[in-house]
């Protein structure tokens, strides 16, 4: 029986490939493999997922809303009123966190689109999803501001650190349920 490796090496020497070319290629591939093995894995990492800023906490209802072009409908009457923090949300990301958070085209709040019932919208009826699919982190060790919660009545995300849980579109105050989310508030607007 013949050895396949020896046959390959012998065929390389018997073909038009010279011994010098063979060792030259062997050296190039060997060095390339060694370099690839020594590089940190981050050298091959994907670029960070895209993020959208201009998300604000409403001073009146405590919900997170998009402040990019209009103020939306607030359940505490009128339009949302943003505070000084500018939150950046990751979208279209396979990374860690909970997906299915969407912008409501009617009230401009961020709501969870993972249930068949789309929650109660301050602009009437249910929320209407549009735009990006946002991913929210919920690890307490993650960088950012914690104590953001899902309201199980209206299905928006709201800030739950203060004793005031904010005004809910489904009536009275928000009711926190599930995970404690962490939002990136590294960009401040003063």
Where are these regions (language model features)?
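N-terminal secretory signal peptides
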Residues: 1-21
